[in-house]
């Protein structure tokens, strides 16, 4: 219909622009809540005032000023309430993506105007349109300005006259059955009725987050990674740290330690919303720097393997290095040959594998005792004692468990609570030993679908949460202080990408709390929805920007998030799939399928991906 028309007219509210509340009258409730007025009474008064103003002036559309004049007797601050209503309209209005896409298409080759029956003034409507990034229209025709309405039909006649068009040359698009469809049709104007999707009856502000992002997110031509950080990572990290803050307040915990390395970004986000009540500290620890010293406190190989699980694809020589040992330390062992050192644990016979693990446990205990002294000194220096919380990305609890063993072997009293993004499958090993809570879900209290969804994106999340420095190996004394000894930083080349994503996320937090200091009443977990959507159905742009990033660590086989690999080479393709960090994205990129998550679910059972 657009292609056959010379003049295209769009309705504004509930067509190009939506409100994040169920009904327009809910805006009045929000104003009442802001001024601590009885919400139901003010909403009723505001509606009655509008009806009275319309009865008083039947010549055309009324103005907001006319409505609030009828409220002055009951509300002495009526003028202030009117400005609050305008400000609330700015806040709750957001672009309807479905219709703005149609609007942009029409703007390419047609004369486009906006036609609305609305009591808000032209400057206010123009500001709402600007906030919603709706531009390119030729003219704005408002009933409040022209004293003509679509409902009466005279506003359409005015539009035709002003644009020098005949009725059959015009198309009007809007949501109201009478004023946007039947009336223009009766004037020989082509009309299309848009039916907005129904909003859920049990929710007041369902699309608050999506509406905010639609209004505030950087433009498409902005830096891709910053925009991704703002629209996807930002809500996710905000939801996580808001949940942490709520929990800390509820349980009267002031001291918080953020575990390196993911904790660097988490602390940066937490500091945006935290007040002076909390003592936030960044703690240089790692799985290696905690679990190796903790081995000094245990007495069996099974406990050793809980702390230092050995993966089949890791070489023997690399595992020795991770433990802070050298191959020469095992020179007296019969298995210590170059051929064996270069094998992966998956290539070893079971008897030889057990012998090597037993030797490692014996040797590392000696190393662990030396490292434990410095680690305890570092923990005392950082005041890791009394009642405190520890925060990490996740997943299984080995670091918190190791810290528990280390602190238990000291004389310092402690009461530790841990926070994860989620508790994953291996958490069962430590669930009876540590106190820990998951933001998205706790171990054993999650649906298989959500568990699978998060599992599919673990490598992407770990990359996005990465710090600006290498992992902590151990500790050393320097100038009277205990300092972390850091490994080489593996993400130096791609850190600008990480930083851009994280900067975008922090910008989101600042913007969101600036507009909604109380979080807009959105449950904390709901903020993870944009991230879950990306994990469930990765957009092609996201795959192409992240797929070729190498996320390998621990000296393993190179792992790319979702590298391009032709299916025509099956063995290579299978190997690439098994080694990919983000398998759903890998499947979608290489198979061009919209069912990548379902395929991942099936293939994971086969390949144990």
Region spans (language model):
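N-terminal accessory alpha/beta regions
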Residues: 45-66
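Nucleic acid-processing catalytic cores of prokaryotic defense/repair systems
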Residues: 19, 27-31, 103, 118, ...
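Active-site neighborhood of HAD-like aspartate-dependent phosphohydrolases
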Residues: 2-45
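Substrate-recognition "cap/lid" segment bordering the active-site pocket of phosphatases
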Residues: 113-115, 119-169
């Amino acid at each position: 219909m657009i292609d056959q028309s010379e003049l295209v007219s769009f309705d504004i509210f509930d067509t190009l622009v939506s409100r994040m509340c169920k009904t327009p009258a809910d805006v009045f409730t929000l104003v009442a809540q802001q001024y601590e007025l009885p919400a139901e009474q003010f909403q009723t008064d505001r509606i009655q005032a509008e009806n009275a103003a319309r009865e008083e002036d039947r010549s055309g559309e009324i103005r907001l000023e006319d409505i609030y004049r009828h409220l002055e007797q009951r509300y002495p601050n009526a003028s202030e309430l009117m400005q609050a209503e305008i400000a609330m309209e700015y806040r709750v209005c957001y672009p309807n993506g479905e219709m703005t896409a149609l609007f942009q298409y029409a703007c390419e080759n047609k004369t486009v105007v906006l036609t609305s029956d609305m009591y808000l003034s032209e400057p206010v409507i123009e500001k709402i349109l600007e906030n919603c990034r709706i531009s390119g229209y030729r003219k704005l025709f408002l009933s409040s300005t022209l004293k003509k309405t679509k409902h009466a039909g005279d506003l359409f006649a005015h539009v035709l006259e002003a644009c020098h068009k005949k009725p059959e040359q015009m198309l009007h698009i809007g949501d109201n059955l009478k004023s946007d469809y039947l009336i223009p049709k009766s004037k020989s104007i082509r009309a299309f009725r848009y039916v907005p999707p129904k909003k859920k009856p049990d929710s007041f502000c369902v699309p608050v987050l999506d509406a905010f992002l639609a209004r505030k997110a950087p433009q498409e031509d902005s830096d891709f990674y910053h925009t991704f950080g703002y629209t996807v990572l930002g809500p996710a990290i905000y939801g996580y740290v808001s949940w942490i803050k709520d929990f800390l307040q509820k349980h009267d915990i002031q001291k918080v330690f953020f575990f390196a390395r993911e904790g660097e970004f988490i602390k940066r986000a937490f500091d945006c919303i935290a007040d002076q009540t909390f003592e936030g500290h960044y703690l240089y620890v790692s799985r290696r720097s905690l679990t190796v010293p903790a081995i000094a406190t245990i007495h069996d190989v099974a406990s050793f393997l809980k702390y230092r699980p050995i993966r089949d694809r890791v070489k023997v020589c690399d595992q020795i290095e991770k433990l802070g040992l050298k191959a020469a330390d095992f020179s007296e062992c019969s298995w210590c040959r170059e051929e064996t050192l270069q094998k992966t644990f998956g290539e070893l016979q079971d008897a030889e594998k057990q012998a090597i693990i037993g030797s490692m446990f014996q040797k590392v205990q000696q190393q662990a005792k030396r490292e434990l002294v410095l680690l305890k000194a570092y923990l005392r220096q950082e005041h890791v004692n009394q009642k405190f919380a520890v925060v990490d990305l996740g997943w299984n609890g080995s670091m918190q468990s190791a810290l528990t063993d280390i602190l238990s072997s000291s004389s310092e009293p402690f009461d530790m609570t841990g926070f994860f993004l989620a508790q994953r499958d291996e958490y069962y090993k430590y669930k009876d030993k540590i106190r820990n809570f998951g933001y998205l879900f706790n171990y054993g209290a999650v649906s298989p679908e959500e568990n699978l969804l998060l599992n599919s994106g673990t490598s992407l999340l770990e990359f996005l949460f990465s710090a600006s420095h290498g992992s902590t190996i151990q500790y050393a004394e320097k100038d009277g202080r205990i300092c972390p000894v850091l490994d080489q930083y593996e993400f130096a080349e791609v850190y600008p990408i990480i930083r851009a994503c994280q900067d975008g996320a922090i910008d989101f937090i600042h913007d969101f709390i600036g507009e909604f200091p109380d979080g807009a009443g959105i449950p904390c977990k709901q903020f993870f929805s944009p991230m879950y959507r990306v994990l469930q159905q990765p957009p092609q742009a996201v795959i192409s920007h992240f797929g070729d990033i190498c996320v390998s660590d621990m000296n393993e086989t190179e792992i790319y998030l979702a590298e391009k690999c032709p299916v025509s080479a099956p063995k290579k393709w299978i190997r690439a799939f098994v080694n990919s960090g983000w398998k759903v994205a890998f499947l979608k990129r290489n198979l061009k399928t919209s069912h990548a998550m379902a395929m991942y679910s099936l293939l994971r059972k086969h390949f144990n991906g």
